[in-house]
UniProtKB/Swiss-Prot annotation:
Keyword field: Ribonucleoprotein, Ribosomal protein
Biological role stated in the UniProt entry: This protein is one of the early assembly proteins of the 50S ribosomal subunit, although it is not seen to bind rRNA by itself. It is important during the early stages of 50S assembly.
Oligomeric and partner information: Part of the 50S ribosomal subunit.
InterPro entries per the UniProt record, alphabetical: Ribosomal_uL13, Ribosomal_uL13_bac-type, Ribosomal_uL13_sf
Taxonomy, superkingdom: Bacteria
Pfam family, one: Ribosomal_L13
Family label: Belongs to the universal ribosomal protein uL13 family.
Name of the featured protein: Large ribosomal subunit protein uL13
Stored NCBIfam families: rplM_bact (TIGR01066)
CDD domains: Ribosomal_L13 (cd00392)
One annotated GO biological process: negative regulation of translation
SUPFAM superfamilies documented for this protein: Ribosomal protein L13 (SSF52161)
Length: 154
C-alpha cells in the first residue's frame, strides 16, 4: 500500500466553533493547535495546510490553573536600552484585547515558520459571545465535555 500524500484538491476545510468559557487555557490551545494543523484528520500531510478554520468565542472567560492569572508574564522589548516590558495575564485579560491571551497560547504551539503563519490565519478569536461567521455554518465542538480536566470553575 502506498503512502497517501494529500494534494490541494484533497483538502476540505470545515468551520469549527469553540466556546472558551470556563475552559483551561493550555488544554484549549492544544486542541485548537491540533485542529489548525490538521492532525485530527486521517489525511494529515505535514507540509500542507490541512487544518480547519476555528472560531473561538468568550475568550475573555478562559481559565488558568494555579496562580498563572497573576504570575504569568507576557514580555516584549521596545528596542531601546532597558526597554524590557511585561504585562501579567490578568492585566491582558482585563484589558482592551483579552483574546490575545488565547491567540498567544495557540501561536506558541504552532510551528514558527511560513506554514505556521498560514495555519494561524485560520484562527478567529472573539472576546464576547458574538461572531460574524454565521454564514459559514460552523459545527460546535464542546471542549469542556471532552475531559473533566478541561474545565475549571473558579
Amino acid at each position: 500500500m502506498k503512502t497517501f500524500t494529500a494534494t490541494p484538491a484533497d483538502i476540505e476545510k470545515k468551520w469549527i466553533l469553540i466556546d472558551a468559557e470556563g475552559v483551561v487555557l493550555g488544554r484549549l490551545a492544544t486542541i485548537v493547535a491540533n485542529i489548525l494543523r490538521g492532525k485530527n484528520k486521517p489525511t494529515f500531510t505535514p507540509h500542507m495546510d490541512m487544518g480547519d478554520n476555528v472560531i473561538i468565542i468568550n475568550a475573555d472567560k478562559v481559565q488558568m490553573t494555579g496562580n498563572k492569572r497573576a504570575d504569568k508574564r507576557y514580555y516584549w522589548h521596545t528596542g531601546h536600552p532597558g526597554g524590557i516590558k511585561f504585562r501579567t495575564a490578568a492585566q491582558v485579560l482585563d484589558g482592551a484585547h483579552p483574546e490575545r491571551v488565547v491567540i498567544k497560547a495557540v501561536e506558541r504551539m504552532i510551528s514558527r515558520n511560513s506554514l505556521g503563519r498560514q495555519q494561524m490565519t485560520n484562527l478567529r478569536v472573539y472576546a464576547g459571545a458574538e461572531h460574524p461567521h454565521e454564514a459559514q455554518q460552523p459545527t460546535v465542538l464542546d471542549v469542556a465535555s471532552l475531559n473533566p480536566k478541561n474545565t475549571r470553575s473558579a
